[in-house]
Amino acid sequence: MEKKELLYEGKAKKVYKTDKEDYYIIEYKDDATAFNGLKKGVIEEKGVVNNKVSSILFEFLEKRGIPTHYVKMLKDREMLVKKVTIFPLEVIIRNYAAGSICKRLGLQEGIKFKEPVLEFCYKNDELGDPMINEYHIRALELATRDEIDLIKERAFKVNEILSEYFLSKDIILVDFKLEFGKNQEGILLADEISPDTCRFWDKNTMEKLDKDRFRKDLGQVEEAYLEILRRVQQV
């Protein structure tokens, strides 16, 4: 598969066309941003870690019946994916109170919800990715009712699978963000699953092992990312 021209560059990834119309190459960057781009920096080897972690998790989910855009890992920083049209939605699943929901609802960090909380955000940098509900999604024609139902069903299933998986690695999956796209195959899980898009806490120490270390200037950011990679690579 030959890499062609750059199609899109985001905060954490570059997307390239290939010599096959239905496939793209994603290259993961070391650039880090937080608070909708207000804080910027570099996390050494982040791109390598996120590419490898995402590849392992996509393969794991595929084996358990979750269709994804992932095809294979090409290089340390690159993966081959199926071309999809991305829904302009962030699908957030929260198992514990952390981050913005604590400020928004006056919750103490670390409270475990009786059941997972699902939130939608409208992917729009100019608006700051505002939270929306299913009525907004249909009104803005971002997805149909059937598509929303399928996305929710898949998101909860991913949460069920990954929560159990990470617990086996002594990691609590606190919350995470998913994105979905569609092509001729149907709706596929897309984007990435990594310490950039998930909150991971060590089960025994409650130490943060994710991008919150960058957001909150906690230090040892690279070490936390590498620790997640080390654990997911364990058989």
From Swiss-Prot:
<keyword id="KW-0658">Purine biosynthesis</keyword>
<keyword id="KW-0436">Ligase</keyword>
<dbReference type="InterPro" id="IPR018236">
    <property type="entry name" value="SAICAR_synthetase_CS"/>
</dbReference>
<dbReference type="InterPro" id="IPR033934">
    <property type="entry name" value="SAICAR_synt_PurC"/>
</dbReference>
<comment type="pathway">
    <text>Purine metabolism; IMP biosynthesis via de novo pathway; 5-amino-1-(5-phospho-D-ribosyl)imidazole-4-carboxamide from 5-amino-1-(5-phospho-D-ribosyl)imidazole-4-carboxylate: step 1/2.</text>
</comment>
<comment type="similarity">
    <text>Belongs to the SAICAR synthetase family.</text>
</comment>
<dbReference type="InterPro" id="IPR001636">
    <property type="entry name" value="SAICAR_synth"/>
</dbReference>
<dbReference type="GO" id="GO:0004639">
    <property type="term" value="F:phosphoribosylaminoimidazolesuccinocarboxamide synthase activity"/>
</dbReference>
<keyword id="KW-0067">ATP-binding</keyword>
<dbReference type="InterPro" id="IPR050089">
    <property type="entry name" value="SAICAR_synthetase"/>
</dbReference>
<dbReference type="GO" id="GO:0005524">
    <property type="term" value="F:ATP binding"/>
</dbReference>
<dbReference type="InterPro" id="IPR028923">
    <property type="entry name" value="SAICAR_synt/ADE2_N"/>
</dbReference>
<dbReference type="GO" id="GO:0009236">
    <property type="term" value="P:cobalamin biosynthetic process"/>
</dbReference>
<dbReference type="GO" id="GO:0006189">
    <property type="term" value="P:'de novo' IMP biosynthetic process"/>
</dbReference>
<keyword id="KW-0547">Nucleotide-binding</keyword>
<protein>
    <recommendedName>
        <fullName>Phosphoribosylaminoimidazole-succinocarboxamide synthase</fullName>
        <ecNumber>6.3.2.6</ecNumber>
    </recommendedName>
</protein>
<dbReference type="Pfam" id="PF01259">
    <property type="entry name" value="SAICAR_synt"/>
</dbReference>
